[in-house]
């Protein structure tokens, strides 16, 4: 739709103007509706930042696909690499964040704001780069991420979204 296209063009321009190089975007196959987003920064006091330095990981790569009714529905967002553990990143690279669900989404959210929230959630959830032999090399799959996300939304719709206590990170 035109609304989606206009909004995504504006989002791309705004991201290109970011002074802190927090994220960068590459279009997948030149599609305005399928983005690979590089998250270059997380909290520098976090174990995840330490992991990134120790493994020479310059960024966390995510894929965002924007539905026809974006910005009124959220993008589907998943981690592509590196393989992460915890930090609300689940099987297939699915991300457990209420704001990525239809109920939690607001059309006012920008991609930059969503990425900043994701970076904070990764650290809060004590995300780490997976270093287990064999497992760390296995890439996440979209199909697995979609199935996991569908399942987690169902669970949260039934039981609600709980903010973990501060003691949990």
Task: Tell where the protein language model's regions lie, with residue ranges.
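UBC/E2-like fold recognition across ubiquitin and ubiquitin-like conjugation systems
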Residues: 1-59, 68-169
């Amino acid at each position: 739709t035109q609304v989606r296209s206009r909004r995504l063009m504006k989002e791309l321009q705004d991201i290109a103007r970011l002074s802190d190089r927090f994220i960068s975007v590459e279009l997948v196959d030149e599609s305005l509706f399928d983005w690979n987003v590089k998250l270059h920064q997380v909290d520098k006091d976090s174990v995840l930042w330490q992991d990134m330095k120790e493994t020479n990981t310059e960024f966390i790569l995510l894929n965002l696909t924007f539905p026809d009714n974006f910005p009124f529905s959220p993008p589907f967002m998943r981690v592509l690499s590196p393989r992460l553990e915890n930090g609300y990143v689940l099987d297939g690279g699915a991300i457990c964040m209420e704001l990525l669900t239809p109920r939690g989404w607001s059309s006012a959210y920008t991609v930059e704001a969503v990425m900043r929230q994701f970076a904070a959630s990764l650290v809060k959830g004590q995300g780490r780069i997976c270093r287990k032999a064999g497992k760390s090399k296995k890439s996440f799959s979209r199909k697995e991420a979609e199935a996991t996300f569908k399942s987690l939304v169902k669970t949260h719709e039934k039981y609600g979204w709980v903010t973990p206590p501060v003691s949990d990170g």
